[in-house]
Amino acid sequence: PRAVVAGHGDFAAGILSAVQQITGLADRFVPLSNTGLSPAGLEDAFRQLLRESGARIVFTDLPAGSCTMAARRIAKTDPELVVVTGVALPTLLAFACGSDVSDAVESGRKALQLVEGPRGA
C-alpha cells in the first residue's frame, strides 16, 4: 500500500470501495476508521498500520478531526510522513493511478465545482 486513508465511521472503507469500483486499485491504500478508538488508541492504530504497510502518506477526512490530529502528532516525530486532509474521491483516484501526492491534491481541488442551481437552494 502507498497510503493510509482514515476517517470517521465507514468513510475510509466507503471511499476506497469507490476507488476499487472505478480503478481496481484500492489495494494501494489501507483504510482506518476512528470508530471506538480513543485519541491514544487511534494514534496507536495509525502507527501500527504505517509500520506494517510501509505507507508514508495519510489521507484524512476532516482538517480538525481526530484522525488528522493523530496523524499530525505522528508527523511531528516522523518528518517523512505526509498528511493530506479534506480528501475527496478525485484525489484518491489520481493518487491510485500514479500521480504524486501534490498532483493528486491538485486534481482534487480542480474537481471541486459549484454547479449553479435555483437560488437559495
Located regions from the model:
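N-terminal loops that bind phosphate or other acidic moieties
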Residues: 1-121
